[in-house]
Amino acid sequence: MKYRKLIILVLSILIILPVSTLDGHHIANADDDPPKKLKYKENSALALNYHRVRKANFLNNFIYFFSSSKEIKNYSVSQSQFESQIKWLKSHDAKFLTLKEFLYYKKKGKFPKRSVWINFDDMDETIYENAYPILKKYKIPATGFIITGHVGEENFHNLDMISKKELKEMYKTGLWEFETHTHDMHNLSKNNKSKLMKASEATIIKDLNKSEKYLTKNFKKSQKTIAYPYGLMNDDKLPVIKKAGLKYGFSLEEKAVTPNSNDYYIPRILISDDAFEHLIKRWDGFHEKD
């Protein structure tokens, strides 16, 4: 009877998940085609973006294997996968950068070989529970892009968000920097247009100023960067992003970063297990000689 109930629960989840994942939470780079090999340029760096790090247990693994949900397949890795990826990067002499270092080298015009910058969007509880301990174990720096108006909120688009107390614990390790993912503009309309893209100039500036104040108050000075909700931005909104005082913007795109990458369209590679296998492991930067 116990196992029968478990099977019914799992099947129910599989039916629900494909149509309820985060209210259409992510759409950038969410196609079903396998990733292609990254084009290699000698002076470049990899910005690796994560969203969810799942606990590696039977139920989660079962759901992952059988589900057609893009949220699960494209926007999450298991805890064991995440640690395996970090260990692979270390074994291939990746130079892990803080955000501050990443921006410094970009501005300077020269990245160290095998430069890697680890970052996370949304900052839900799975990052604190499953990614943070691994990064702390290996002393790897990371950046979290926070939806500052929803810190600690339960059931935000089906996610339990990380708490302020947990963020401060992470910050005190010296390994974490926190930047804005907007204050309260992480929503999609019915036509898959983000709230940020539809809002007026005054509304956007007010939102980003609130987020900046939160970050400055709790985590000292930020680097004046934003990870766009859903990785989406267009040119007609850039003037207001600049007017709000932001100096860099991050999208989601399967490209390495070069010094010439547009400061407001800096590409980050969305990491899933498949993306790491096809894109990161095959990147020529990890296979060239010093």
Swiss-Prot record:
SUPFAM superfamilies: Glycoside hydrolase/deacetylase (SSF88713)
Gene Ontology terms: cellular component: extracellular region
Range of residues in the leader sequence: 1-28
Domain of life of the native organism: Bacteria
Major location (coarse): secreted
Localization terms from the record: Secreted, Cell wall
EC primary class: hydrolase
Enzyme Commission number(s): 3.5.1.-
GO BP annotations listed: carbohydrate metabolic process
Gene3D superfamilies in the record: Glycoside hydrolase/deacetylase (3.20.20.370)
Keyword tags: Cell wall, Hydrolase, Secreted, Signal
InterPro entries recorded: Glyco_hydro/deAcase_b/a-brl, NODB_dom, PNAG_deacetylase, Polysacch_Deacetylase
Domain NodB homology stretches: 114-290
PROSITE patterns: NODB
UniProt-recorded Gene Ontology molecular function terms: hydrolase activity, acting on carbon-nitrogen (but not peptide) bonds, in linear amides
UniProt-listed Pfam families: Polysacc_deac_1
Function: Catalyzes the N-deacetylation of poly-beta-1,6-N-acetyl-D-glucosamine (PNAG, also referred to as PIA), a biofilm adhesin polysaccharide. N-deacetylation is crucial for attachment of the polysaccharide to the bacterial cell surface; it leads to the introduction of positive charges in the otherwise neutral PIA polymer, allowing electrostatic interactions.
Family: Belongs to the polysaccharide deacetylase family.
Protein name: Poly-beta-1,6-N-acetyl-D-glucosamine N-deacetylase
Protein source organism: Staphylococcus aureus (strain MRSA252)
